[in-house]
Each structure stands twice: as C-alpha cells, then as structure tokens.
C-alpha cells in the first residue's frame, strides 16, 4: 500500500500557480477528497497531514524546502515512520507528457528533475512510485527553467486540473496497494490534447520567443528553485 503521498513544488505565493507546482496541486486535491488539512511540521520540513483510512494511516506531504532539496523532507518523514520507498508515491510535473495526461510508474531515473534527483539521494533508493503529471515542453531545452517556473496558459491549466480530478478515482486503489487497478484508472482515459502555446514574436525581429514567463526572482537565504533540465 501507499503510506506516504508527496507532491513536489516550491513554497511561496510567487510559485503557487507555476507549472513546477503541479505536485502541490495534486496533494491539495487529495487532501480535499480525504477531508484532511495540511499543517506545517518543522521536523519534516513541510506541510503535512495524517489521514486515518480503512487500510491504516496515510501521510500527505508538501516539502517546503524548495524543489532541489525535496528529499530532505521526504526522507525525514519516511525514516521516522519507517515507510519503505515502495510505499511512497511522489506526484510531480512532467515535461515529456502534454497537459492533461498522466502516468504512474515505479523506479527509474530522475530525467533531470532536481526534486526527484534529491529524493533519490536522500532515500538511497529509486524504488518509490511516481505520478507524472504532464505540463508539456517549451520545445527548446534552454527555455525549460523559465517554462516550469512560469504559469500555464488557461487552456493548459484547465487540462492539468481536469487530469488531477480524474486521478482521484485511483486514490482508493493506491491506498490499498492495488497498483494494477490504479494504473488502469490513471492511464485509460486520455483527454483531447490542448493546443500548444502560440509563439510570440520578439519585437522587430519576427523571431518567436520561446519563453512564456519571466524568470522567478532569487530569494535571499533560500535554496534556489532549480528545475528539470538544469545541469547537475
């Protein structure tokens, strides 16, 4: 069974609506469905909720450490409650899936996602489950950092939100450990693909600009919010 459900993102209102926070959006939706309230827990470096379910207690977690040190939070809670990697599900934004699609998988590499990279390192294992929430790709590798820290266009946000709503039908299966049933529910229904964002021409050049959002400001004294596609 899944005993710990984690959503990845960056803390703070400036990041709340950005693509990189799709994991937070998912945990928020699960918390509403399970009638749970997240609260700050310094010992686990995140927002936490404990939910009593028919199959036992389940923890919800949103690390507040910034993306690239998410593993600090996940490992702290998992070790204290003796939760094995295969009992952990991490929901995160996925560049390689279009908005509105999702995939469930266990194990594998981090594919450049620094949140997953740190969880790998802190847990010492890659055996945890991942719920990959599609956000689409900007089409240019150099623009990935700007893209994930930008807000999705309305049509894309609606597709991601609808995907999250559909995923809630699999929560019971995830909690009971019926991963085949959960996978079937998560993978069978695919929505129409939203249109890609329209390139905006750079003034006076006729060349489309790849980025759709400004860079997030640096935050003094905090870990940088590094992202998928950043160099190690």
From Swiss-Prot:
The active site is at 20 (proton acceptor). It comes from the Bacteria. This is Peptidyl-tRNA hydrolase. Its main location: cytoplasm. Pfam families: Pept_tRNA_hydro. It catalyses: an N-acyl-L-alpha-aminoacyl-tRNA + H2O = an N-acyl-L-amino acid + a tRNA + H(+). Belongs to the PTH family. InterPro entries: Pept_tRNA_hydro, Pept_tRNA_hydro_CS, Pept_tRNA_hydro_sf. Residues 200-220 have a biased composition (Low complexity). Its EC number is 3.1.1.29. Monomer. It is an enzyme of class 3 (hydrolase). GO terms for biological process: protein quality control for misfolded or incompletely synthesized proteins; rescue of stalled ribosome. TRNA binds at residues 15, 66, 68, 114. It is found in: Cytoplasm. Residues 186-232 are annotated as: Disordered. The record marks 93 as: Stabilizes the basic form of H active site to accept a proton.
